[in-house]
């Protein structure tokens, strides 16, 4: 799918991925920072609220502890610590306003005096109660953990302090406090319904809790999946499938006990603002991506215009009319400008090479046409030579008949000698004409050989030019391959350049294939030219032999003429001369027959040469057609 996308779309896709990745990283980082900030703010908030709540509880308890200490001091100063005086001290309004009850358990008798009065169970002995024994053991004011009152059955909290009168232990004075005030202090922390507060001891026992079912239970029972450690700070726990923040703040200044105010806040509620911010950030990211893509698309369209023009020019050369006159307009000095300059230089070199090949192809076509014309002329001359040779053969036959007639009729020797003289003169002229024709044929064959040799040399030059073209194609292919390798090393940023390099390499490969086809045609043309040269050389050799034979025939006809001229003076040796003449005529007839045979072979060779020249002309036309496919 990615291969079918254009380079600009790939850049847009990559940019979109980069922008989305960058904004995603920003959102994640900002979410992390916001989460940390919210957690820090939550910790600070819970710490401040916990400290304030612990301080309120501490202040409330310290005021009651001062009242218990004052009660103990008043009881210690009694002149007569009897029950009436003790009751009088316990009945003071300040105690009734701040305590549910105040009382004294005497050490000596176990008497229990309480105001307001409330009947205790039968056999009740204060000296066996925890508030009594713990205060006596500590020998100072203590605060007990909440417990169930033996008289009312209510959950209360007690403060007790040993009382000494005149150096002797009088008993332990104590005050009971109901937990409504502490519960009200804790329940005032609602956190808009997202949390609550409770009181816990350092041992993990829950002293006060909005859920009454958890009072006096341990944290392990309240948090079965993992109880938080009771140390100052904020902890994250899981309860009923939801995560909660739990902070512990110690209540300072309590003698004998260590209590902590525990604040619980729902984590999702604390992070609710983050969800809104995250949604807003995602929407902003989508808007930013769309806007950036639109702007980047327009910018890429402008920046990619040189590359688009380059691709269109390459397509015109590869699939259009092969117009090598087109050049790219260089408007910048960047990578596109460098690539455009390189493309223009490459097309310029191809243009010059094709132009030279075109000129050579035209010259080759012209030379081939000249060779064809010369071969046609040679064919006409060969026909004329054949006719002349037939005439000579007929004359020789007549000469032989005349010689036989001389032998049969010596009386008519002079007359026949005269006729023979005339015929010999005619034969000599024919032979001289034949010699001249053979010389002209030899010269034309020599010229044809020279032209074919020149044609062969030019085809070699064309082959050298094609070798240069093939070298250029191979070098271009190598450069394109190196460019593709460098683009692969550059990764996504170099894919567009890799596509261009691949197209250049394809063009170089096609140019190399065309050069190889032309090279093959030139090689076939060279083979035909060499065959034509060999044939013309053979024809020239036969022509020279024909000239030599014709010269010999001329010489012999001259001898015949001279002998016929002497017939009148040598009539006595007619018989002998006639026999010699017959032998010479037979020999001449054989020579003429051989000349005729050689002439026929020469005609056949010329026909073969003509066919080779026609093939040469055809190949030259094909080469010219291939070159004309380019616009130069």
UniProtKB/Swiss-Prot annotation:
GO MF terms, alphabetically ordered: amino acid binding
Question: Which amino acids does the record list as binding 4-aminobutanoate?
Answer: 124, 129-131, 150, 176
What residue ranges lie in the Cytoplasmic compartment?
1-10, 301-632
Tell me the compartments it is located in.
Cell inner membrane
Name a biological process GO annotation: signal transduction
Compositional bias (Basic and acidic residues) spans? 413-427
Give a short account of what the protein does: Chemotactic-signal transducers respond to changes in the concentration of attractants and repellents in the environment, transduce a signal from the outside to the inside of the cell, and facilitate sensory adaptation through the variation of the level of methylation. Responds to L-His, L-Pro and gamma-aminobutyrate (GABA). Also involved in repellent responses to trichloroethylene (TCE), chloroform and methylthiocyanate. Also mediates chemotaxis to histamine, but does not bind histamine.
Name-wise, this protein is Methyl-accepting chemotaxis protein PctC
Q: Which organism is it from?
A: Pseudomonas aeruginosa (strain ATCC 15692 / DSM 22644 / CIP 104116 / JCM 14847 / LMG 12228 / 1C / PRS 101 / PAO1)
- The primary gene name is pctC
């Amino acid at each position: 799918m990615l291969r079918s996308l254009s380079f600009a779309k790939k850049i847009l896709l990559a940019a979109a991925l980069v922008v989305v990745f960058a904004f995603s990283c920003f959102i994640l980082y900002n979410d992390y920072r916001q989460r940390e900030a919210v957690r820090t703010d939550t910790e600070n908030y819970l710490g401040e609220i916990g400290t304030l709540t612990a301080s309120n509880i501490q202040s409330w308890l310290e005021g009651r502890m001062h009242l218990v200490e004052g009660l103990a001091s008043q009881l210690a100063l009694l002149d007569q610590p009897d029950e009436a005086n003790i009751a009088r001290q316990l009945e003071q309004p300040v105690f009734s306003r701040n305590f549910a009850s105040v009382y004294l358990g005497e050490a000596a008798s176990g008497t229990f005096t309480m105001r307001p009065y409330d009947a205790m169970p039968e056999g009740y002995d204060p000296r066996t109660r925890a508030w009594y024994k713990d205060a006596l053991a500590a020998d100072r004011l203590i605060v007990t953990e909440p417990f169930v009152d033996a008289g009312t059955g209510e959950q209360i909290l007690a403060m007790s302090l040993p009382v000494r009168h005149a150096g002797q232990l009088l008993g332990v004075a104590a005050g009971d406090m109901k937990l409504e005030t502490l519960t009200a202090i804790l329940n005032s922390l609602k956190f808009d319904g997202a949390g609550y507060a409770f009181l816990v001891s350092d041992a993990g026992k829950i002293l006060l809790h909005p859920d009454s079912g958890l009072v006096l239970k341990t944290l392990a029972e309240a948090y079965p999946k993992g109880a938080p450690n009771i140390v100052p700070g904020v902890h994250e726990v899981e309860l009923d499938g939801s995560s909660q923040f739990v902070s512990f703040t110690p209540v300072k200044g309590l003698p004998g006990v260590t209590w902590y105010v525990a604040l619980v806040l729902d984590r999702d509620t604390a992070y609710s603002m983050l969800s809104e911010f995250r949604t807003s950030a995602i929407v902003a990211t989508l808007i930013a991506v769309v806007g950036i893509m639109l702007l980047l698309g327009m910018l890429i369209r402008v920046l990619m215009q040189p590359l688009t023009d380059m691709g269109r020019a390459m397509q015109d050369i590869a699939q259009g009319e092969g117009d090598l006159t087109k050049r790219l307009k260089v408007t910048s000095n960047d990578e596109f400008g460098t690539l455009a300059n390189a493309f223009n230089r490459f097309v310029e070199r191809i243009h010059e090479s094709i132009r030279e090949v075109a000129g050579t192809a035209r010259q080759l076509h012209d030379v081939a046409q000249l060779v064809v014309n010369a071969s046609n002329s040679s064919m006409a001359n060969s026909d004329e030579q054949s006719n002349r040779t037939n005439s000579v053969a007929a004359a020789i036959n007549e000469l032989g008949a005349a010689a036989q007639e001389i032998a049969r009729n010596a009386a008519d020797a002079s007359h026949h000698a005269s006729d023979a003289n005339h015929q010999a003169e005619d034969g000599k002229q024919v032979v001289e004409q034949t010699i001249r024709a053979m010389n002209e044929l030899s010269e034309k064959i020599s010229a044809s050989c020279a032209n074919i040799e020149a044609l062969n040399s030019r085809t070699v030059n064309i082959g050298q030019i094609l070798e240069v073209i093939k070298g250029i194609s191979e070098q271009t292919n190598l450069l394109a391959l190196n460019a593709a390798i460098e683009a692969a090393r550059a990764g996504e940023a170099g894919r567009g350049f890799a596509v261009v390099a691949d197209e250049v390499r394809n063009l170089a490969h096609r140019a190399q294939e065309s050069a190889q086809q032309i090279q093959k045609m030139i090689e076939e043309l060279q083979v035909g030219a060499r065959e034509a040269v060999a044939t013309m050389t053979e024809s020239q050799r036969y022509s020279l032999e024909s000239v030599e034979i014709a010269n010999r025939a001329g010489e012999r006809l001259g001898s015949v003429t001279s002998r016929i001229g002497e017939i009148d003076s040598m009539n006595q040796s007619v018989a002998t001369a006639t026999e010699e003449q017959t032998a010479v005529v037979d020999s001449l007839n054989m020579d003429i027959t051989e000349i005729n045979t050689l002439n026929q072979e020469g005609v056949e060779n010329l026909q073969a040469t003509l066919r080779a020249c026609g093939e040469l002309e055809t190949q030259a036309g094909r080469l010219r057609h291939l070159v004309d496919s380019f616009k130069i």
